[in-house]
Amino acid sequence: MAGYATTPSPMQTLQEEAVCAICLDYFKDPVSISCGHNFCRGCVTQLWSKEDEEDQNEEEDEWEEEEDEEAVGAMDGWDGSIREVLYRGNADEELFQDQDDDELWLGDSGITNWDNVDYMWDEEEEEEEEDQDYYLGGLRPDLRIDVYREEEILEAYDEDEDEELYPDIHPPPSLPLPGQFTCPQCRKSFTRRSFRPNLQLANMVQIIRQMCPTPYRGNRSNDQGMCFKHQEALKLFCEVDKEAICVVCRESRSHKQHSVLPLEEVVQEYQEIKLETTLVGILQIEQESIHSKAYNQ
């Protein structure tokens, strides 16, 4: 006699509607999301917080890697600029260190004659150029260096200080903007944290709980071939975690980078291996039996 499927009673159907698809228990402070499905406030909040934390950690890791690369390049340029300025400064100091402090333009009274300041600087610049030609004239062109007055070095150093010594530092990453949340039941995406309290459902759950303390999960029960978390058919097999998963699990962070196979292929391969192992065992037993009979004869 062929069996027939039993239909749940109206009370069982009512109980099933009062069960959260995430925790598989009666709703606690139920809220409705944009697609119309209901969940416990604590369940959906915890799910969102976990995803937000993972997203933020990934963005911070990417930002730190970019900052490390930029810092290495900036430090190379900074170090080169410092060495160039120090080298030129030392060359300038050695070039003009032979000038005595007594070589000042003083008047007959022994007091500095400030009227001759312009003449003093012009003549000193000419002497510096002559000294530079004297010291560097005999060098090969590829060994020559530029020698500048101290004032020019300091002026150029101040202009490039902000650009080279203090490279642009990007501000820390801002908090991630609201992303997309996929409903565990219908997988429809919508803006996160867009839910509203469902007071009518909360009152109904309270009445049902008094009548039936233990919830009836019906099709939401973790029967064989159904995902306990997403209530989807287990159609895939994760080769890394060695477990059957649903299509929603496949898109989650825990399995997104893993290699998966259709569950049917894995089951078929397993059955073939099991059958082959069984046949090999039977053949070995038969061979041992034949050898035993031949030995006894």
Curated annotation (Swiss-Prot):
Annotated zinc fingers (B box-type), start-end: 222-263
Induction: Up-regulated by Golgi stress-inducing agents such nigericin, trichostatin, tetoposide, campothecin and brefeldin A. Up-regulated by IL1B/interleukin-1 beta and TNFA/TNF-alpha.
Keyword list, A-Z: Antiviral defense, Cytoplasm, Metal-binding, Nucleus, Transferase, Ubl conjugation, Ubl conjugation pathway, Zinc, Zinc-finger
EC number: 2.3.2.27
GO biological process: defense response to virus; innate immune response; positive regulation of canonical NF-kappaB signal transduction; positive regulation of NF-kappaB transcription factor activity; protein autoubiquitination; protein ubiquitination
Pathway as given in its UniProt record: Protein modification; protein ubiquitination
Stretch list, region Important for rapid proteolytic degradation by the proteasome: 72-167
Subcellular location: Cytoplasm; Cytoplasm, Cytosol; Nucleus
Signal sequence coordinates: none
PROSITE patterns: ZF_BBOX, ZF_RING_1, ZF_RING_2
Gene Ontology MF terms: transcription coactivator activity; ubiquitin protein ligase activity; zinc ion binding
GO cellular component, one term: cytoplasm
Main location, first listed in the record: cytoplasm
Chemical reaction(s) catalysed: S-ubiquitinyl-[E2 ubiquitin-conjugating enzyme]-L-cysteine + [acceptor protein]-L-lysine = [E2 ubiquitin-conjugating enzyme]-L-cysteine + N(6)-ubiquitinyl-[acceptor protein]-L-lysine
SMART domains: BBOX, RING
Zinc-finger ranges (RING-type): 20-62
Similarity-based family: Belongs to the TRIM/RBCC family.
Oligomer status and interactors: (Microbial infection) Interacts with Japanese encephalitis virus non-structural protein 2 (NS2A); mediates the ubiquitination of NS2A, targeting it for proteasome-mediated degradation.
Record text about domains: The RING-type zinc finger domain is essential for its E3 ubiquitin-protein ligase activity, ability to positively regulate the NF-kappa-B signaling pathway and its antiviral activity.
Protein name, per record: E3 ubiquitin-protein ligase TRIM52
Organism: Homo sapiens (Human)
